Amino acid sequence: MKVIGAGWPRTGTLSTREALTRLGLPCYHMAEVALHEDYTRAWYSFLIERKPMDWKALFSNYSATVDAPAAFFYREIFAAFPDARVVLNLRDPESWYKSYMTLHGAMQDLSPHRHANPRLDMWLQVVEAIHEHSVGANADRDRCIAAFNAHNRRVQEEIPKDRLLVFRVQEGWAPLCEFLGCEVPYEPFPHLNEGADTVKAGLAFIFGIS
């Protein structure tokens, strides 16, 4: 594990995942948890059953991780991989909140299908546990934004400055490549933004919902 993404979902993590992949760093992301039942089970065991997580086994096929669920456990992952570098994606808190809640709502729209779909049910329990862990089960706007800001402060206080990049995807390749010690690719920085409807359609396909 070379790069730990500590930025919350909807801060440009999908673009960062694609950028790291293009730099030769296979990158773990919430999409992997949906796509691979073994990863869903691992997070279910950790978050719901409260069993220890084997971080090295979880990330054995990856050189980087961004987005949920891993971003919420950057401390534990950094302890397991102390030589890794940490990237903290930032975004305006108000625009982050609107995007995050829209996405969370899209995921919850799948809930009526969960009782006939055990794999979807397990994945939604993971999503709900992450939401409760990060902002609280019934958090309003102010609590969500406060939790978001508090997380970003903690990361900057706890991670050594020489191991941390505070990053906005609008900055493009230069700061990321300088931080990682690699050459800037001869291609535009990827700017990916999956809307809630696209995410919901993708999840419906993954979980076989028609």
Task: For each feature predicted by the language model, list its residue ranges.
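Short active-site oxyanion
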Residues: M1-I4, N61-A64, A84-R85, K161-L165
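The conserved 3'-phosphoadenosine-5'-phosphosulfate
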Residues: E32-R41, V87-Y97, R114-H115, A150-I209
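Short, well-ordered alpha-helical microsegments
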Residues: T13-L14, A71-R75, Y97, W173-L176
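PAPS-dependent sulfotransferase catalytic domain
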Residues: T21, L25-P26, E32, L47-F59, R75-V166, ...
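Short His-Asn-centered micro-motif
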Residues: G5-G7, V66-A70, L90-R91, V169-Q170
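Conserved nucleotide-sensing/catalytic segment adjacent to the nucleotide-binding pocket
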Residues: S45-I77, F81
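PAPS-dependent sulfotransferase catalytic core
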Residues: M1-S60
